[in-house]
């Protein structure tokens, strides 16, 4: 008899068939309490859980006594109570490698769009404001040869540094928990403390996970340390930034512009002042959102769950100690 799993994400047919070859699959729209109650028997017997974005907490785990592995279609997992899973000896699998290049592309796009005011001037053209040869009111600023500061030199940070160093001849500064010798050797990146990075960088790009230490790492003090010409990019997690402090910094001219893929609360409220600022490019958490990469993430998550329920957790496991 095949193990049973709960699937709370719609998958392409080929990936669904791959799951069904190994498991009895119960598909549900979400992990809301009413959904769990409606499918109580399936949740109670499920050994695997696969999906994305929904909260996985102690209350859910109480309804899933047979659960052995959870697989998220994401690199981030701040919506999952990892400690609760580990205490139950449930492994958590994620997809950290397949989205690296795509997210780095998104960060680069935000840098270019904010610096060259692509969204702002495109909207002005659509509004019929381009009636004569443009002047300085339409100008942006250069990207090439400007100093890039990367906060969080992981896989995505490395991919961004590669693009900036080789493609745009940008000096690269970085701040991370530890020195990254490969970044220094390949891209001539310079490690520095956060204050120094903020003071020297023309672009401050944040690519950090959300942890107790990183929550609101960027606030009033940090924005005040940046150049008034600096462009701030966040493609990590929204709550790493105190959004009210960012709004104030933009309104007061403490920084030049911001390109944002993530926000403290998502979806972003239609009343957010960020949406009324011409120097803000706000996109709806599209970091990995290409057809190719999202498919690859789903395929990776499927393979991760198959492997985990066969006891293979050598790669992509968040909490390998749970298997001990």
From Swiss-Prot:
<comment type="function">
    <text>Catalyzes the NADPH-dependent reduction of glyoxylate and hydroxypyruvate into glycolate and glycerate, respectively.</text>
</comment>
<dbReference type="InterPro" id="IPR006139">
    <property type="entry name" value="D-isomer_2_OHA_DH_cat_dom"/>
</dbReference>
<dbReference type="GO" id="GO:0120509">
    <property type="term" value="F:hydroxypyruvate reductase (NADPH) activity"/>
</dbReference>
<dbReference type="InterPro" id="IPR029753">
    <property type="entry name" value="D-isomer_DH_CS"/>
</dbReference>
<dbReference type="Pfam" id="PF00389">
    <property type="entry name" value="2-Hacid_dh"/>
</dbReference>
<feature type="active site" description="Proton donor">
    <location>
        <position position="285"/>
    </location>
</feature>
<protein>
    <recommendedName>
        <fullName>Glyoxylate/hydroxypyruvate reductase B</fullName>
        <ecNumber>1.1.1.79</ecNumber>
        <ecNumber>1.1.1.81</ecNumber>
    </recommendedName>
</protein>
<dbReference type="GO" id="GO:0051287">
    <property type="term" value="F:NAD binding"/>
</dbReference>
<dbReference type="GO" id="GO:0005829">
    <property type="term" value="C:cytosol"/>
</dbReference>
<dbReference type="InterPro" id="IPR050223">
    <property type="entry name" value="D-isomer_2-hydroxyacid_DH"/>
</dbReference>
<comment type="similarity">
    <text>Belongs to the D-isomer specific 2-hydroxyacid dehydrogenase family. GhrB subfamily.</text>
</comment>
<dbReference type="InterPro" id="IPR006140">
    <property type="entry name" value="D-isomer_DH_NAD-bd"/>
</dbReference>
<dbReference type="Pfam" id="PF02826">
    <property type="entry name" value="2-Hacid_dh_C"/>
</dbReference>
<dbReference type="GO" id="GO:0008465">
    <property type="term" value="F:hydroxypyruvate reductase (NADH) activity"/>
</dbReference>
<dbReference type="GO" id="GO:0030267">
    <property type="term" value="F:glyoxylate reductase (NADPH) activity"/>
</dbReference>
<keyword id="KW-0963">Cytoplasm</keyword>
<dbReference type="GO" id="GO:0005886">
    <property type="term" value="C:plasma membrane"/>
</dbReference>
<feature type="active site">
    <location>
        <position position="266"/>
    </location>
</feature>
<keyword id="KW-0560">Oxidoreductase</keyword>
<feature type="active site">
    <location>
        <position position="237"/>
    </location>
</feature>
<dbReference type="InterPro" id="IPR023756">
    <property type="entry name" value="Glyo/OHPyrv_Rdtase_B"/>
</dbReference>
<keyword id="KW-0521">NADP</keyword>
<comment type="subunit">
    <text>Homodimer.</text>
</comment>
<keyword id="KW-0520">NAD</keyword>
<dbReference type="InterPro" id="IPR036291">
    <property type="entry name" value="NAD(P)-bd_dom_sf"/>
</dbReference>
